Structure formats: C-alpha cells, structure tokens
Design a protein with these regions (language model features):
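Core segments of cupin and vicinal oxygen chelate
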Residues: 40-90
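Acidic/polar helix N-cap motif
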Residues: 44, 121-122
C-alpha cells in the first residue's frame, strides 16, 4: 500500500522477453480493467487503415460511419486499432514528429507519445522489409535498455509505433 491505494493488491508481472526490466516488475493491477483499443483520428482513414494492413498485416474487421465520419476497426496482435476520419466541428491539430534527444526519443509534448508492439520474429529482417516498402524510421534499429532490439516507425497521421524484439 505504498501508493495509498488499499483496494488494489500488489502483483508481479513476469515478462521474460523484456530483460531491460530485469525480467519482472511489481505493479498494481485492477482486474476490473482489460485493454480495449487505440483510437486514431486520421485525415485519410481508409488510406491509413490500408497502411496498417500492408505494412503490419493488420486485418480490417469493420468499416462503418460514426457521427458522419468513417470509422475503421483493425485487429493487430490481438488488439483493436480504430481509425476514424474528421467529424463536423472538430479542428484536429497536426501531431508533432518524434525527435531524438541525448539518450531517448520523444514527441516532446504532453499526451500519448507512442504505442508499442512486441515483435515475435526476426525484427531486423522485418525492419529491412519495411524499409524496402518505404517506411520511415525516426529511430533506427538499436539496442534498448537491457540489450533488447527496438526501433520506431513513423505511421500515418503522426503516429509513432515502437517495435521491440520479443
């Protein structure tokens, strides 16, 4: 109860493939929650959805109109990405590009910086395959904390995705 939250019990999460955390970490977890989706606002939602299909092998599972804008549901790695278009009354601001700092990379803005996927395969070969397709990497392949291989992909709509070797 170090953080003053008595209703949550301490749990140990074991991630043997993520050695930069020493293989495990102590965390507080609330079993009432499960992860549902990432929602991306796009100027070109169908083109963006196609990019995730062509580059990462995502599957389009639904394509609807919600509040006057396209809303496309993708499945990738057992998770849902929702890409939707501009809705009347919105004035979305462009996302900042990710940039390198001395020892890390960041969008240097409040809010979501990036999301990440563990890649269960040869990340170096997948990186090369994406390069051949013209994908941009603001952070090229490198050894992360603890020695795991990682890179950052520039996805459509200013989205940054970290790929980590599982």
């Amino acid at each position: 109860m170090e953080d003053g939250v008595p209703h949550l019990e301490e749990r140990t999460i074991v991630r043997p493939s993520r050695s930069f955390l020493g293989g495990s970490l102590s965390a507080m977890s609330n079993p009432a929650f499960t992860f549902d989706h990432i929602h991306i606002i796009s100027q070109t939602p169908h083109e963006s959805a196609t990019w995730y299909v062509e580059m990462f092998g995502a599957a389009i599972v639904a394509d609807k109109i919600a509040y006057g804008a396209p809303q496309i549901f993708l499945e990738l790695g057992g998770k849902t990405l929702i890409i939707r278009g501009h809705r009347e009354g919105e004035t979305p601001m462009p996302a900042r590009p990710i940039q390198p700092f001395a020892r890390f990379s960041s969008h240097n803005a409040w809010g979501t910086d990036h999301f990440g996927f563990l890649y269960h395969g040869d990340l170096r070969a997948f990186h090369d395959e994406l390069c051949a397709k013209g994908v941009q990497f603001p952070v090229e392949l490198k050894q992360g904390n603890g020695g795991h291989l990682l890179c950052y992909v520039s996805a459509p709509d200013g989205v940054s995705i970290e790929l980590m070797q599982a």
